[in-house]
């Protein structure tokens, strides 16, 4: 009886499973699913008994009981009992199903054009701005700018000046022609200087040329100074303007101090007393201070008529007046008159000559 009862239960379960499978098969046929999906669904229903009970409850049948596991021996039921599936097997089947679906989707998407694929990817994922791309774009833009600027210049008005690509610190468009002319003038003058200065042609470079020219000019200046000093020492020339200035100073000092006057005048040993006589009237004038400097002198009180011979006193001799140390009395300017300050005159004269030569150069 027990075996008959067990056979009835197993038959009842098998009938319910057959009905569920038939219903699910109809649904799957309507949805057009694969056999693998159906098997996976039945595997999940057997794994989770709650879902199986819900499905069986909705169909109006009793849920099947879980089969008892046997140690290596099959069940003694009249029919075949279902084997319990492990969750690992179910997961493996689901993974294989997902892989097959992805393979089919890729095969369906392969006929698409590559441009459409790129557009779809661009819409789906926004590209990130790379830091190197911006720098490359900035570097590429200046390279393209000269070509574009040149094309615009040629397309527009033709300029009269010559366009020169200027570097930093140089002239550009409108000033390029003037800059070129200025440089040509400088180079031409440097060539002239090279021809004038001996040994400058061997030097290369503007800096070396300028050094050679400066050294040559300095040597010329030293030679001119030496020659001018030599000429001044060999040929002294009195500058009368300087002499007048010195006389004016000496006379002004003599007016303030009459004792300093004989130092400027002729030496007393060279002057004959008989030639230079001062009248009593002049002595009174000098004592009274009415005369300017007391230099009024008379040769003799005797007056001779015009055209007649000049009378000379008996005791006086004319030779001492006309001859001073064997030289003419009129040559007194270079020998006796300036004997007190010959050295200052020579130094002043040499300085004046040097100044005049430098001004002429």
From Swiss-Prot:
One of its GO terms (molecular function) is DNA-binding transcription factor activity. Expressed in panicles, leaves, leaves sheaths, lamina joints, stems and roots. Residues 124-138 have a biased composition (Basic and acidic residues). Residues 170-183 are annotated as: Basic motif. SMART domains: HLH. Residues 146-157 have a biased composition (Polar residues). Residues 184-220 are annotated as: Helix-loop-helix motif. One of its GO terms (cellular component) is nucleus. InterPro entries: bHLH_dom, bHLH_ZIP_TF, HLH_DNA-bd_sf. Residues 66-160 are annotated as: Disordered. Residues 170-220 form the bHLH domain. This is Basic helix-loop-helix protein 79. It comes from Oryza sativa subsp. japonica.
